Protein backbone atom coordinates (compact mmCIF):
# COMPACT_ATOMS: atom_id res chain seq x y z
CA UNK A 1 0.00 0.00 0.00
CA UNK A 2 1.28 3.48 -0.87
CA UNK A 3 0.81 6.13 1.81
CA UNK A 4 0.59 9.88 1.35
CA UNK A 5 3.61 10.53 3.55
CA UNK A 6 3.50 14.31 3.50
CA UNK A 7 -0.06 14.30 4.80
CA UNK A 8 0.80 11.68 7.40
CA UNK A 9 3.72 13.80 8.61
CA UNK A 10 1.36 16.72 9.07
CA UNK A 11 -0.89 14.50 11.16
CA UNK A 12 2.10 13.38 13.24
CA UNK A 13 3.12 16.97 13.97
CA UNK A 14 -0.44 17.95 14.84
CA UNK A 15 -1.14 15.14 17.27
CA UNK A 16 2.36 15.19 18.78
CA UNK A 17 1.70 18.84 19.60
CA UNK A 18 -1.64 17.90 21.13
CA UNK A 19 0.00 15.43 23.50
CA UNK A 20 2.49 18.05 24.67
CA UNK A 21 -0.04 20.83 25.07
CA UNK A 22 -1.56 21.70 28.42
CA UNK A 23 -5.35 21.60 28.85
CA UNK A 24 -7.14 24.86 28.34
CA UNK A 25 -8.23 26.85 31.35
CA UNK A 26 -11.76 26.22 32.55
CA UNK A 27 -14.29 28.05 30.44
CA UNK A 28 -15.90 31.10 31.97
CA UNK A 29 -19.52 32.13 32.39
CA UNK A 30 -22.15 29.80 30.94
CA UNK A 31 -19.44 27.55 29.55
CA UNK A 32 -19.05 26.23 33.09
CA UNK A 33 -22.56 24.73 33.15
CA UNK A 34 -21.72 21.57 31.18
CA UNK A 35 -17.96 20.99 31.42
CA UNK A 36 -18.45 17.49 30.03
CA UNK A 37 -21.08 16.46 27.47
CA UNK A 38 -24.47 15.95 29.16
CA UNK A 39 -25.77 12.39 29.28
CA UNK A 40 -29.27 11.13 29.83
CA UNK A 41 -32.53 9.99 28.26
CA UNK A 42 -34.73 11.97 25.87
CA UNK A 43 -38.41 11.14 25.43
CA UNK A 44 -39.06 12.05 21.78
CA UNK A 45 -37.90 9.10 19.68
CA UNK A 46 -39.76 6.49 21.69
CA UNK A 47 -42.78 8.38 23.04
CA UNK A 48 -43.18 11.49 20.88
CA UNK A 49 -45.78 13.60 22.78
CA UNK A 50 -47.38 10.62 24.53
CA UNK A 51 -45.72 11.48 27.84
CA UNK A 52 -46.85 11.85 31.45
CA UNK A 53 -45.51 12.35 34.94
CA UNK A 54 -46.04 8.65 35.65
CA UNK A 55 -43.84 7.76 32.69
CA UNK A 56 -41.09 10.18 33.74
CA UNK A 57 -41.11 8.77 37.27
CA UNK A 58 -40.81 5.22 35.91
CA UNK A 59 -37.93 6.27 33.68
CA UNK A 60 -36.19 7.91 36.64
CA UNK A 61 -36.59 4.76 38.71
CA UNK A 62 -35.33 2.64 35.84
CA UNK A 63 -32.26 4.79 35.20
CA UNK A 64 -31.22 4.36 38.81
CA UNK A 65 -32.04 0.67 39.24
CA UNK A 66 -30.37 -0.50 36.02
CA UNK A 67 -27.07 1.35 36.39
CA UNK A 68 -27.53 4.13 33.86
CA UNK A 69 -27.38 6.89 36.47
CA UNK A 70 -24.23 5.41 37.97
CA UNK A 71 -22.67 5.26 34.48
CA UNK A 72 -23.22 9.01 34.04
CA UNK A 73 -26.67 9.28 32.44
CA UNK A 74 -28.01 11.96 34.79
CA UNK A 75 -30.59 13.84 32.73
CA UNK A 76 -34.17 13.07 31.83
CA UNK A 77 -34.99 15.37 28.92
CA UNK A 78 -38.74 15.92 28.55
CA UNK A 79 -39.24 16.78 24.88
CA UNK A 80 -42.22 18.38 23.11
CA UNK A 81 -45.77 17.72 24.25
CA UNK A 82 -45.72 18.57 27.95
CA UNK A 83 -47.28 22.03 27.53
CA UNK A 84 -50.81 22.96 28.54
CA UNK A 85 -50.87 26.53 27.24
CA UNK A 86 -50.74 29.64 29.45
CA UNK A 87 -52.74 30.74 32.45
CA UNK A 88 -54.45 34.11 32.94
CA UNK A 89 -51.10 35.71 33.79
CA UNK A 90 -49.49 34.20 30.70
CA UNK A 91 -47.42 31.79 32.75
CA UNK A 92 -46.67 28.65 30.78
CA UNK A 93 -48.26 25.60 32.39
CA UNK A 94 -47.97 21.84 31.93
CA UNK A 95 -50.81 19.78 30.52
CA UNK A 96 -52.98 19.11 33.60
CA UNK A 97 -53.95 15.65 32.37
CA UNK A 98 -50.42 14.50 31.59
CA UNK A 99 -48.81 16.23 34.57
CA UNK A 100 -51.51 16.65 37.22
CA UNK A 101 -49.01 17.16 40.06
CA UNK A 102 -47.18 19.90 38.19
CA UNK A 103 -43.60 20.21 37.04
CA UNK A 104 -42.11 21.26 40.36
CA UNK A 105 -43.29 18.08 42.05
CA UNK A 106 -41.91 16.05 39.16
CA UNK A 107 -38.57 17.87 39.27
CA UNK A 108 -38.39 17.26 43.02
CA UNK A 109 -38.92 13.54 42.44
CA UNK A 110 -36.28 13.37 39.72
CA UNK A 111 -33.82 15.28 41.90
CA UNK A 112 -34.51 12.93 44.81
CA UNK A 113 -33.14 10.14 42.62
CA UNK A 114 -29.91 12.03 42.07
CA UNK A 115 -30.94 12.94 38.51
CA UNK A 116 -31.49 16.18 36.61
CA UNK A 117 -34.54 17.33 34.64
CA UNK A 118 -34.56 18.93 31.23
CA UNK A 119 -37.53 20.47 29.43
CA UNK A 120 -38.38 21.66 25.93
CA UNK A 121 -39.59 24.85 24.26
CA UNK A 122 -39.28 26.71 20.97
CA UNK A 123 -38.05 30.13 19.82
CA UNK A 124 -41.43 30.80 18.20
CA UNK A 125 -45.08 31.02 19.19
CA UNK A 126 -45.57 27.31 18.54
CA UNK A 127 -43.30 24.30 18.96
CA UNK A 128 -42.53 21.77 16.25
CA UNK A 129 -45.51 19.65 17.34
CA UNK A 130 -47.82 22.66 17.61
CA UNK A 131 -47.68 23.25 21.37
CA UNK A 132 -47.04 26.54 23.18
CA UNK A 133 -43.63 28.10 22.46
CA UNK A 134 -41.65 30.73 24.36
CA UNK A 135 -41.16 33.52 21.80
CA UNK A 136 -42.14 36.81 23.41
CA UNK A 137 -42.22 35.22 26.87
CA UNK A 138 -38.54 34.39 27.31
CA UNK A 139 -38.01 36.05 30.70
CA UNK A 140 -41.31 34.85 32.07
CA UNK A 141 -40.76 31.26 30.94
CA UNK A 142 -37.15 31.19 32.14
CA UNK A 143 -38.31 32.33 35.57
CA UNK A 144 -41.03 29.66 35.56
CA UNK A 145 -38.54 26.95 34.60
CA UNK A 146 -36.26 28.10 37.42
CA UNK A 147 -39.12 28.00 39.94
CA UNK A 148 -39.94 24.46 38.85
CA UNK A 149 -36.33 23.35 39.36
CA UNK A 150 -35.50 22.70 35.70
CA UNK A 151 -31.82 22.07 34.93
CA UNK A 152 -31.74 22.17 31.13
CA UNK A 153 -33.76 23.68 28.28
CA UNK A 154 -33.84 22.18 24.80
CA UNK A 155 -34.80 25.16 22.66
CA UNK A 156 -36.08 24.32 19.18
CA UNK A 157 -36.44 26.55 16.09
CA UNK A 158 -39.61 25.47 14.31
CA UNK A 159 -41.93 28.19 12.89
CA UNK A 160 -39.07 30.71 13.10
CA UNK A 161 -37.36 32.79 10.38
CA UNK A 162 -34.62 31.09 8.38
CA UNK A 163 -32.13 33.84 9.10
CA UNK A 164 -28.90 33.42 11.06
CA UNK A 165 -29.00 36.88 12.65
CA UNK A 166 -32.59 36.40 13.80
CA UNK A 167 -31.80 32.95 15.18
CA UNK A 168 -28.82 34.35 17.08
CA UNK A 169 -31.00 37.11 18.50
CA UNK A 170 -33.79 34.77 19.60
CA UNK A 171 -31.44 32.31 21.24
CA UNK A 172 -29.48 35.10 22.89
CA UNK A 173 -32.71 36.44 24.36
CA UNK A 174 -33.50 33.09 25.96
CA UNK A 175 -29.88 32.57 26.98
CA UNK A 176 -29.88 35.90 28.81
CA UNK A 177 -33.24 35.11 30.39
CA UNK A 178 -31.96 31.80 31.72
CA UNK A 179 -28.85 33.46 33.08
CA UNK A 180 -31.03 35.99 34.94
CA UNK A 181 -33.52 33.39 36.17
CA UNK A 182 -31.82 32.74 39.48
CA UNK A 183 -31.04 29.11 38.64
CA UNK A 184 -28.31 27.44 36.61
CA UNK A 185 -30.14 26.14 33.54
CA UNK A 186 -28.13 24.92 30.57
CA UNK A 187 -29.35 25.91 27.09
CA UNK A 188 -29.40 23.40 24.25
CA UNK A 189 -29.61 25.16 20.87
CA UNK A 190 -31.73 22.94 18.61
CA UNK A 191 -31.52 24.84 15.32
CA UNK A 192 -30.37 21.74 13.33
CA UNK A 193 -27.12 23.28 12.04
CA UNK A 194 -28.70 25.05 9.08
CA UNK A 195 -27.88 28.63 10.11
CA UNK A 196 -24.25 28.07 11.19
CA UNK A 197 -24.88 27.87 14.95
CA UNK A 198 -21.24 26.93 15.50
CA UNK A 199 -20.47 30.61 14.82
CA UNK A 200 -22.93 32.12 17.30
CA UNK A 201 -24.59 29.56 19.61
CA UNK A 202 -21.90 29.80 22.27
CA UNK A 203 -22.17 33.59 22.34
CA UNK A 204 -25.95 33.23 22.64
CA UNK A 205 -25.48 31.25 25.84
CA UNK A 206 -25.73 27.74 24.39
CA UNK A 207 -23.95 24.90 26.16
CA UNK A 208 -24.39 22.80 23.02
CA UNK A 209 -25.92 23.06 19.58
CA UNK A 210 -27.31 20.63 17.07
CA UNK A 211 -25.24 20.05 13.95
CA UNK A 212 -27.95 18.44 11.78
CA UNK A 213 -31.60 17.65 11.27
CA UNK A 214 -33.08 14.89 13.43
CA UNK A 215 -31.32 11.54 13.43
CA UNK A 216 -33.28 8.62 11.98
CA UNK A 217 -32.94 4.94 12.77
CA UNK A 218 -30.73 4.12 9.77
CA UNK A 219 -27.10 3.93 8.71
CA UNK A 220 -27.38 6.54 5.98
CA UNK A 221 -29.97 8.27 3.83
CA UNK A 222 -30.74 6.16 0.77
CA UNK A 223 -34.22 7.45 -0.05
CA UNK A 224 -33.27 11.10 -0.61
CA UNK A 225 -36.00 12.52 1.61
CA UNK A 226 -33.74 14.47 3.94
CA UNK A 227 -33.46 11.93 6.75
CA UNK A 228 -30.21 11.86 8.70
CA UNK A 229 -28.56 8.51 9.29
CA UNK A 230 -25.56 7.75 11.50
CA UNK A 231 -23.03 8.18 8.69
CA UNK A 232 -24.69 11.36 7.41
CA UNK A 233 -24.28 13.03 10.81
CA UNK A 234 -20.69 11.85 11.14
CA UNK A 235 -19.94 13.45 7.76
CA UNK A 236 -21.51 16.74 8.86
CA UNK A 237 -19.68 16.77 12.20
CA UNK A 238 -16.17 15.99 10.92
CA UNK A 239 -15.21 19.54 9.84
CA UNK A 240 -16.72 21.12 12.98
CA UNK A 241 -14.31 19.55 15.50
CA UNK A 242 -12.57 22.83 16.33
CA UNK A 243 -15.78 24.34 17.75
CA UNK A 244 -16.14 21.76 20.54
CA UNK A 245 -14.72 22.18 24.01
CA UNK A 246 -15.60 22.17 27.71
CA UNK A 247 -18.97 23.85 28.09
CA UNK A 248 -19.73 24.11 24.36
CA UNK A 249 -20.48 20.87 22.56
CA UNK A 250 -21.41 19.61 19.11
CA UNK A 251 -24.80 17.94 19.55
CA UNK A 252 -25.14 15.08 17.06
CA UNK A 253 -28.71 14.39 18.29
CA UNK A 254 -30.09 11.39 20.14
CA UNK A 255 -28.60 7.93 20.33
CA UNK A 256 -30.77 5.55 18.35
CA UNK A 257 -29.14 2.49 19.91
CA UNK A 258 -31.77 -0.15 20.63
CA UNK A 259 -34.66 1.43 18.73
CA UNK A 260 -34.62 -1.51 16.31
CA UNK A 261 -36.82 0.18 13.71
CA UNK A 262 -39.89 -0.05 15.92
CA UNK A 263 -41.54 3.12 14.72
CA UNK A 264 -41.99 6.61 16.07
CA UNK A 265 -40.27 9.75 14.73
CA UNK A 266 -36.98 7.90 14.31
CA UNK A 267 -38.58 5.67 11.67
CA UNK A 268 -39.62 8.59 9.46
CA UNK A 269 -37.79 9.37 6.19
CA UNK A 270 -36.36 5.91 5.71
CA UNK A 271 -35.52 4.97 9.29
CA UNK A 272 -35.95 1.21 9.03
CA UNK A 273 -33.55 0.26 11.82
CA UNK A 274 -29.85 -0.51 12.17
CA UNK A 275 -27.66 -3.50 12.95
CA UNK A 276 -25.98 -3.60 16.33
CA UNK A 277 -22.65 -3.12 14.58
CA UNK A 278 -24.04 0.18 13.29
CA UNK A 279 -25.42 1.10 16.70
CA UNK A 280 -21.98 0.43 18.17
CA UNK A 281 -20.47 2.74 15.57
CA UNK A 282 -22.92 5.46 16.56
CA UNK A 283 -21.90 5.17 20.21
CA UNK A 284 -18.23 5.10 19.21
CA UNK A 285 -18.31 8.20 17.04
CA UNK A 286 -20.65 10.21 19.27
CA UNK A 287 -18.11 9.60 22.04
CA UNK A 288 -15.13 10.41 19.82
CA UNK A 289 -16.70 13.75 18.82
CA UNK A 290 -17.62 14.54 22.47
CA UNK A 291 -21.30 14.76 21.60
CA UNK A 292 -23.97 14.72 24.31
CA UNK A 293 -25.32 11.20 24.83
CA UNK A 294 -29.12 11.15 24.96
CA UNK A 295 -30.59 7.66 24.90
CA UNK A 296 -33.98 7.35 23.24
CA UNK A 297 -34.88 3.65 23.21
CA UNK A 298 -37.43 1.86 25.38
CA UNK A 299 -35.72 1.87 28.77
CA UNK A 300 -38.55 -0.19 30.21
CA UNK A 301 -38.04 -3.05 27.73
CA UNK A 302 -34.44 -3.29 26.51
CA UNK A 303 -32.11 -6.12 25.55
CA UNK A 304 -28.58 -6.90 26.72
CA UNK A 305 -27.02 -5.94 23.38
CA UNK A 306 -28.35 -2.41 23.86
CA UNK A 307 -27.09 -2.24 27.44
CA UNK A 308 -23.66 -3.54 26.44
CA UNK A 309 -23.25 -0.62 24.04
CA UNK A 310 -24.71 2.14 26.20
CA UNK A 311 -23.04 1.08 29.46
CA UNK A 312 -19.51 0.58 28.14
CA UNK A 313 -17.55 2.45 30.82
CA UNK A 314 -14.40 2.76 28.72
CA UNK A 315 -16.32 4.29 25.84
CA UNK A 316 -18.15 6.68 28.15
CA UNK A 317 -14.82 7.69 29.69
CA UNK A 318 -13.63 8.86 26.26
CA UNK A 319 -16.80 10.90 25.81
CA UNK A 320 -16.41 12.47 29.26
CA UNK A 321 -12.65 13.02 29.17
CA UNK A 322 -11.64 16.32 30.77
CA UNK A 323 -9.79 17.67 27.73
CA UNK A 324 -13.13 17.92 25.98
CA UNK A 325 -11.78 17.92 22.44
CA UNK A 326 -13.64 16.44 19.50
CA UNK A 327 -11.86 13.90 17.32
CA UNK A 328 -10.13 14.98 14.15
CA UNK A 329 -10.07 12.83 11.05
CA UNK A 330 -6.58 11.91 9.83
CA UNK A 331 -5.99 12.19 6.10
CA UNK A 332 -5.41 8.53 5.30
CA UNK A 333 -5.70 6.64 2.00
CA UNK A 334 -8.14 3.83 1.43
CA UNK A 335 -11.73 3.08 2.31
CA UNK A 336 -11.45 3.08 6.09
CA UNK A 337 -11.44 6.32 8.07
CA UNK A 338 -9.07 7.11 10.93
CA UNK A 339 -9.86 9.53 13.76
CA UNK A 340 -7.72 10.72 16.67
CA UNK A 341 -8.74 12.49 19.85
CA UNK A 342 -6.47 13.73 22.62
CA UNK A 343 -7.23 12.42 26.10
CA UNK A 344 -5.94 13.26 29.55
CA UNK A 345 -2.97 11.34 30.91
CA UNK A 346 -0.90 11.61 27.71
CA UNK A 347 -3.22 9.25 25.87
CA UNK A 348 -5.04 9.30 22.57
CA UNK A 349 -8.31 7.78 21.48
CA UNK A 350 -8.08 6.16 18.05
CA UNK A 351 -11.12 5.17 16.02
CA UNK A 352 -10.96 3.20 12.77
CA UNK A 353 -14.26 3.09 10.89
CA UNK A 354 -15.31 1.10 7.85
CA UNK A 355 -18.10 3.14 6.21
CA UNK A 356 -18.39 0.78 3.26
CA UNK A 357 -20.75 -2.13 2.65
CA UNK A 358 -17.88 -4.64 2.33
CA UNK A 359 -15.35 -6.03 4.85
CA UNK A 360 -12.04 -4.18 4.86
CA UNK A 361 -8.50 -4.92 6.03
CA UNK A 362 -6.28 -2.04 7.08
CA UNK A 363 -2.62 -1.53 7.88
CA UNK A 364 -2.13 1.67 9.84
CA UNK A 365 1.44 2.98 10.25
CA UNK A 366 1.91 4.07 13.85
CA UNK A 367 3.66 7.19 12.60
CA UNK A 368 0.11 8.51 12.21
CA UNK A 369 -0.10 8.54 16.00
CA UNK A 370 3.32 9.87 16.96
CA UNK A 371 7.05 9.23 17.07
CA UNK A 372 7.25 6.43 19.63
CA UNK A 373 8.45 3.01 18.49
CA UNK A 374 5.84 1.04 20.40
CA UNK A 375 2.28 1.67 21.57
CA UNK A 376 -0.16 -0.06 23.88
CA UNK A 377 -3.58 -0.36 22.25
CA UNK A 378 -6.50 -0.84 24.61
CA UNK A 379 -9.50 -2.14 22.64
CA UNK A 380 -12.44 -0.29 24.17
CA UNK A 381 -15.06 -2.74 22.92
CA UNK A 382 -13.16 -5.99 23.47
CA UNK A 383 -11.52 -4.80 26.71
CA UNK A 384 -8.14 -6.21 25.69
CA UNK A 385 -4.69 -4.61 25.52
CA UNK A 386 -1.96 -5.39 22.97
CA UNK A 387 1.40 -3.88 22.04
CA UNK A 388 2.02 -2.81 18.46
CA UNK A 389 5.18 -1.68 16.69
CA UNK A 390 5.44 0.23 13.40
CA UNK A 391 2.03 -0.87 12.09
CA UNK A 392 -1.39 -1.75 13.45
CA UNK A 393 -3.33 -4.29 11.41
CA UNK A 394 -6.99 -5.12 11.63
CA UNK A 395 -10.09 -6.34 9.86
CA UNK A 396 -13.38 -4.47 9.98
CA UNK A 397 -16.84 -5.65 9.08
CA UNK A 398 -19.16 -3.38 7.06
CA UNK A 399 -20.04 -0.25 9.06
CA UNK A 400 -17.90 -1.39 12.01
CA UNK A 401 -15.79 0.96 14.13
CA UNK A 402 -12.93 -0.15 16.35
CA UNK A 403 -11.90 2.20 19.15
CA UNK A 404 -8.68 2.14 21.15
CA UNK A 405 -7.07 4.19 23.86
CA UNK A 406 -3.41 4.46 22.88
CA UNK A 407 -0.37 5.05 25.09
CA UNK A 408 3.28 5.30 24.04
CA UNK A 409 5.59 2.66 25.56
Regions found by a protein language model. Name each.
Residues 11-23:
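Bacterial N-terminal signal peptides
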Residues 37-43, 72-79, 116-121, 151-156, ...:
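Structural recognition of the beta-strand scaffold that forms the well-ordered cores
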Residues 59, 63-164, 170:
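Aromatic-lined carbohydrate-binding/catalytic grooves of carbohydrate-active enzymes
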Residues 115-131, 179-196:
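Aromatic-lined carbohydrate-recognition surfaces of secreted/lumenal glycan-active proteins
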Residues 137, 186-298:
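Glycan-recognition surfaces
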Residues 280, 286-289, 294-296, 332-371:
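Carbohydrate-binding surface patches
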Residues 281-330:
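Catalytic cores of secreted or luminal carbohydrate-active enzymes
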Residues 388-409:
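C-terminal beta-strand-rich structural cap/linker in extracellular carbohydrate-active enzymes
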Amino acid sequence: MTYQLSKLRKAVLFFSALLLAAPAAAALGRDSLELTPPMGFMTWNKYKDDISEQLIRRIADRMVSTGYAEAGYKYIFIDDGWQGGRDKRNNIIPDPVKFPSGMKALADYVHSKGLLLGIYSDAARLTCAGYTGSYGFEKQDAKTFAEWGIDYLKYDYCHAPSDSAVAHQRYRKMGDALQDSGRKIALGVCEWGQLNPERWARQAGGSLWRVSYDVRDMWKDIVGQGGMGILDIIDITEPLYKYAGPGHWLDMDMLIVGLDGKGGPSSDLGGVGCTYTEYQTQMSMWCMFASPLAMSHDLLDENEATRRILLNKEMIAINQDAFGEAARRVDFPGVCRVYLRRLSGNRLALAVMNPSDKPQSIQLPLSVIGKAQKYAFRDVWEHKTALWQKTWQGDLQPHETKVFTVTAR
